[in-house]
Every structure is written in structure tokens, then in C-alpha cells.
Amino acid sequence: MKYDLTITPTPEKAEVSVTMREDHGADIYDITITSDEPVTGVKLSFHIPAGDIAGRWFPRMKMFDKGVHNSWEGATWTNFTGGAPLVSFYRSDDRNRLTAALSDCKAAWALNIGVDDRTKCLEFIAETKKVSISSESNKYTLSLFIDASTEGTSPDGSKLCDMTTMGARNERYWWESVRAASDFMASFCPSHRLPDFAFDPVFSSWYSFQRGIFADKVLEQCGMAYDLGCRTLILDDGWQTTPGVEDYSCAGDWTPNRDKFPDMKGFVDKVHAIGMRAMIWIGPGLCGDASKLSKLYGDKKIPGGWVLDPRFPEVRARMTEDVCRAAEKYGFDGLKIDFLDSFQGGDVRPENADGRDYLSLTDAVDDMARLISRRLSEISPDFLIEYRQNYTGPAIMANANMIRVGDCPQDYLTNRVGSIDLRLHTHAAVHSDMVQFNPDEPVEVSALQMVNILFCTPQVSVMFDQISEEQRQMLKFWLGFMSEKRELLQKSELMPHRCDANYSYVTARNDEEELHAMYSERLLMLDKPRKRVYIVNGVDRKPLYVGSNEKLTAHCRILDCTGREVKNETITIDCSPARVDVPMCGMAVIDLVI
């Protein structure tokens, strides 16, 4: 083997067989563990030389700590509803140093990954004490993805990995390796149908109204949202609550509050008449103490929690009916399914099952999610299902076609990092957290919320009649541009440079066009540019500089953050970078002269 791979099964007497193959541009180790008694866990590890490591990427929300870390300082956990067993270490030149991933995305993995200061090696240690098997089995299979960049030796001089036959793929960028690892993990899971309208801009009621939503008020905002470019409404939390209730004490009673929505079916019909699809928020499993649901199922909650225990078959049936009623009775086109990461707790033993037909909480949540997805797909094969960070792994995402950045109101940095992270390791339509801003702030400051989410589907949650006319024009421009250029921005090659600097500039390109979003960098050197180049100034009011190793002549239009043209000129781009005065949150549109 190319790597000093150690595998320790539970039970320890189990037999382990390993075969290696190349796929997804990496080394894949297929591991089979067999035993005379049930296989319950496994620990595996390998190491490579710890040279040229600039930082670490990991698919969990708000992972601003890009440090390399020590392998002994504590585990990072992933499970079915939290992240994915995937990690990447990148070099100072944005190239991949090591990317590793596991095929089992249901198991709870403890990942100890980092530098061992004693051996000066980069260690990967993954352990699960409960493999994801619904019923105990004497056989367990697991595949390990390894993509490392250089040949090296350990301190005692022995060779750690033989990379001499791996060729040019060792020089790919870290994000290319992460995407390959994501494809590898997804190959073990079914995929969900993904309609193009899952990428349509969204108006969400949450930040606009909180729980104080009423049918007529939402419809007023929908009309304005449609005029600005939104094509989907998400009716968020509050449609089911009594006015004035600001907590989850009544959560679980998923019927419309008649003071707010006296005719929910009629409301959905009016949203459709405006020209928008309608989605509705729901948190399956939530069971507040003051809810009617608690009186029926209060003894079937997860111990110590505020959610129902889906290991009871009647609980799964009730949650499925509650969720599907919104589509079947009211005509909604999609669901925003929240709080799936609240199903946390230990497994139970057979003698303590007490009517549960699953011992594993993970398997019960998986069964419930698959049942809901299947029922909704029977209603419409293109039914929209939105999940949220952190339940983003390929196993659970097999049941959804939209994934949203976790809540980060007015935090455009988290929205930028979160949306890029989701683009790299999921295969659904990635949505931003809802954009909101202060109606009294300068329009270019408000526009920071938009230009930082260019590479995902925008969700907006403002009161459109309470913002300035300039802010409305800004939204109309960027929503229109992002919708028109979705093939470039969301479905083409994505290059998020400088992960250690929270993606200081990001590039998307296809055969005809490319876009560069400059978030910290001021100098852009074009390399074999496409016919049209967009450059977005996401920094401040200072100028940008554009250069190239070959002499280029181009027409350059400068737009401000509302889309208004402020300059139109012919420029020369060469090894002496040209100054391009792009306003804050504006854009340069450069057409090369052939």
C-alpha cells in the first residue's frame, strides 16, 4: 500500500481485508471487516510528512479556524445530521496537500486530524464506535479516499507513501480534490431530483416578519419581491402560532393559525397568481410542552430533549403526516425542513426499547427523512425540499434538493464562507442565509450582503416598502444578474482562492465567460481569459488593478452597485496592471477585442 494504513476493528479478532483502486483521481481503499460476532466499530489511521501545509478545510458551519491543529488536541465530530467525514489540507499555493474522506456518512466519526509534533507527520485518525448498520451484522464495508500531493519519508527514513505513479493529479487545487472527495462520498448515496427552479431567487418571511406574519401583509411583500426578481416565497415560522407567542412552547401543532391565515389554500393560490412558487417552514419532531402534540406523545420524547423520538413507529408516521399535509392539503410547492440536527441522543438497548422499532436514533431519522422525501416526490417529482447547515452530508442530503447556509443575519462574511463551503461538498442548489440590511445605511454598504453570496442562490428577507429606492434598485440589479448568470455562477467551475483568508477572491468560469469576485485582493492577473470577464469589487472604495502576461485590448464598462453605468472605455491590459476604478460593490464588464 502507498500509505501506512492501520485498521483496528471491534471486535479486535475480526478479519480485515483491504484492496486498493484508483478512482475520482485519488487512491480508494476498500475495507471489509468480517467476524464471528457483530462488527460494532472501527478505527483507522495513516500519516504523511507534514510539509508545506497552510491550513485545513472542514465542512462545518462557521469554521473560521483554518489552523492546521495538533492531532492530539481533541476530536472533530461528524454524524448523519452534522457535517461529513471529509477534511482537506492545502498548501500555500492553493494546491492540495492531503484530502481524505470516508464513504460511511451515517456513522458518528471522531476525527483526530493534524500534525503530530513527535513524528513531524500529518496524521489522519478516524474512529466510530457504532457503525451505521440498522441491525447488527458480522460484516462491515468502508471505503477510504486519499489524495496526497508528494512523496515523503518519516523521521526514521522509511518511505511513507509512494507517489511516483500518481502523475499530474498531485498538482490539482485543494478545492478540486475536495470536490472529487464529495463526488466519491455521494457515489454511495442515492441522488435527489434537482429542478432548475430550485436555483430561483427566494423571498423569505423570517427576518422581515419574524413570527408576526399575516396573509395579507405577506402577499403585499410578495408582489414587490416578484418585481425585484424573486420567484419563490418561503413562508417561515409563525404561520401556525398564536400572535404574541415568541418561543417554541407550542411547537408541534402544525395547523395554520386562523387569525393569521384564515384560508391557507387560498393564500397559496394568490402567491401562485403573483407568479411565485410557495414553500412553507416546518420543524418535524419539535414538541413544545404547551402543544396539543405533547399531550398525545409527550412520553415519546428523546430523553432530556424537546423533540419526539422517531424510533417509535407512530411518531415517524405522525411527523410524516404533519409534513406532507402542507403539500397535499394547501398546495405548497416545497418545504423548508428545520431542526433535523436536533435529533440527538444515545442508542437504546433491546430491553429498554419500550415500543421502539429502531434501537439506533440515526437509522430512525434516516428512515423518517426518506419516507418524507418519497411521499413528497409522489405529490410532485420536482417538489422542493430545503435543508440547512449543518445537516449537509450526502447520506441525509439524498432526501433534499436545496441546502441553505445556517442563520447569520447581516453577517456577509459567514454567508460567503458558508455558501462556498456548501458549493464544494454538496450536490444540491446552495442557498444563502436570508439577506437583510439596515434601510438607513448607504446602498453600497447594503450591497455587501449581495456581492458576498454571488456563487449561490440568493434568499432575501427585507420589507421592500421600507427600504430606499436605491436599495430596491440594487436588489433588482443583483437578483437579476445572479438569476441570468446562474449557469456561470452556480453550475460552472468554481475556484475559491485563499481559504486561509476566508476566500479572499473567488472565480467562476465556463467556456465563454469568467467572473472574479475580489473580497480582499486588489490585484487580478488574468490567465488565458475568456471572451468576457466580470470583476466585482467586494472590498471598498479603493481601485482594483488588472494585469496579464500577454497584451490584451478590451472594452470596459464600469457599473455601480445598482447596475448604473458610470464609465465606458477601451483599456490595455498587460504585465503593467491597469487601474480599474470599480465602485464599492460595483462591477467591471470587460469584453476582449479579438
Regions found by a protein language model. Give the residues of each.
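Active-site-adjacent "subsite" loops/lids of carbohydrate-active enzymes
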Residues: A198-D200, Y207-R211, D269, R277-Y330, ...
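The substrate-binding groove and active-site-proximal loops of carbohydrate-active enzymes
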Residues: D200-D216, Y248-P262, I302-T320, P350-V365
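Active-site-proximal substrate-binding groove within the catalytic cores of carbohydrate-active enzymes
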Residues: D147, G152, D156, M368-M584
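Catalytic domains of carbohydrate-active enzymes, especially glycoside hydrolases
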Residues: K217-T241, K329-D333
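Glycine-rich, aromatic-flanked loop segments that form ligand/cofactor-binding clefts
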Residues: Y173-P190, T232-D237, D259-G304, D382-E386, ...
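N-terminal accessory beta-strand-rich subdomains and adjacent acidic, glycine-rich linkers
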Residues: M1-M185, C189, N415, S548, ...
